[in-house]
Amino acid sequence: MARVKYGKVKVTRARRKRWIKLAKGYFGTKKSSYKKAHEQVIRSMAYAFIGRKERKRDFRSLWIVRINAAVRPEGLSYSTFMHGLKLANININRKMLSELAINNNEEFKKIVKQAKKALNK
C-alpha cells in the first residue's frame, strides 16, 4: 500500500473545515457533519441566489403599492398616473416617486397635478 503524505491530509482537512465554517449557525448535524453541512451550504447558496433576484421584484412591487396608495386620494389609479407622467415627459423612477410620496408629500402632489394636466390635454 502506498504511503499517504501528510500534506494531502492537511488539504482535505482544510477543505472540510471551510465547508463546516460556512455552515455556522445551522441546526443539528448540518453544522457539524461534513456531508450534511456541505449539502446544506450548497442549498443555502442556491436560495440566496434566488433571493437576490426576488428582492428586486419585491421592492418594485412595494414602490408600486406605495405610489398607488398616494395617488388614489387624488382621484387617479396607478396606471393612469404613470400614463400621465409619460405624457407630461416626467422621467422619475418608481423608487423616487414612492420616496416623494412618503417623505415629501407636497412635491408629490405637484407631480400628480402635472400628470393630471397632461391627461386632460
Swiss-Prot record:
Pfam families for the chain: Ribosomal_L20
Quote a single Gene Ontology cellular component term.
ribonucleoprotein complex
PROSITE patterns reported for this sequence: RIBOSOMAL_L20
Q: Does the keyword Ribosomal protein apply?
A: yes
Q: In terms of domain of life, where is this protein from?
A: Bacteria
Lineage, top ranks:
Bacteria, Bacillati, Mycoplasmatota, Mollicutes, Mycoplasmataceae
Q: What's this protein's family per the entry?
A: Belongs to the bacterial ribosomal protein bL20 family.
Q: Which keywords does the record carry?
A: Ribonucleoprotein, Ribosomal protein, RNA-binding, rRNA-binding
| Biological process terms in GO annotation | ribosomal large subunit assembly; translation
Name of the protein in its database record: Large ribosomal subunit protein bL20
Biological role: Binds directly to 23S ribosomal RNA and is necessary for the in vitro assembly process of the 50S ribosomal subunit. It is not involved in the protein synthesizing functions of that subunit.
Q: Where is the signal peptide?
A: none
Keyword Transmembrane helix part of the UniProt annotation: no
- HAMAP family assigned: Ribosomal_bL20 (MF_00382)
Tell me one GO molecular function of this protein. Answer: rRNA binding
